[in-house]
């Protein structure tokens, strides 16, 4: 069996611009891409916290340490400078790959600086603790 698992998450990054006439994609600060384990032309999903739009595109590197997060092409219609977004990518893994797979979680501040960077696994102690805390939310 294969499972689709979160590979990378950039949480609450601010859109810095939009270029409707660029051919497509999201331009993202190269250092943020590396922290999140994203490579150029990788498929990503974008969730716009401000307006609820959810869409997919691909990522291309922007200026390193510039804080760039620019919607390009048709995606430019789905967000504006100042909007807060969440960027995710997924991995398709078999059961063996899942055992040691590392998830990159990158948390941003208001200036598009990395506030926190976590690398975790599906079976980490932290994830087990969250599951344990939430089990009493399940109703019989």
From Swiss-Prot:
Q: What InterPro entries does the record tag this protein with?
A: Asp_de-COase-like_dom_sf (IPR009010), Asp_decarbox (IPR003190)
Query: Is Lyase tagged as a keyword?
Result: yes
General function of this protein: Catalyzes the pyruvoyl-dependent decarboxylation of aspartate to produce beta-alanine.
Name the enzyme group at the top EC level: lyase
CDD domains given in the database record = Asp_decarbox
Q: What is its EC number?
A: 4.1.1.11
One cellular-component annotation, GO: cytosol
Name the pathway it acts in.
Cofactor biosynthesis; (R)-pantothenate biosynthesis; beta-alanine from L-aspartate: step 1/1
In which family does this protein belong, per the annotation? Belongs to the PanD family.
Superkingdom per UniProt: Bacteria
* The keyword Lyase appears for this protein: yes
Molecular function as annotated in GO: aspartate 1-decarboxylase activity
Q: How does it assemble?
A: Heterooctamer of four alpha and four beta subunits.
Question: What is the source species?
Answer: Persephonella marina (strain DSM 14350 / EX-H1)
Compartments in which it is found: Cytoplasm
Q: What keywords is this UniProt entry annotated with?
A: Autocatalytic cleavage, Cytoplasm, Decarboxylase, Lyase, Pantothenate biosynthesis, Pyruvate, Schiff base, Zymogen
Q: What is this protein called?
A: Aspartate 1-decarboxylase
- What does the record say about how the cofactor binds? Binds 1 pyruvoyl group covalently per subunit.
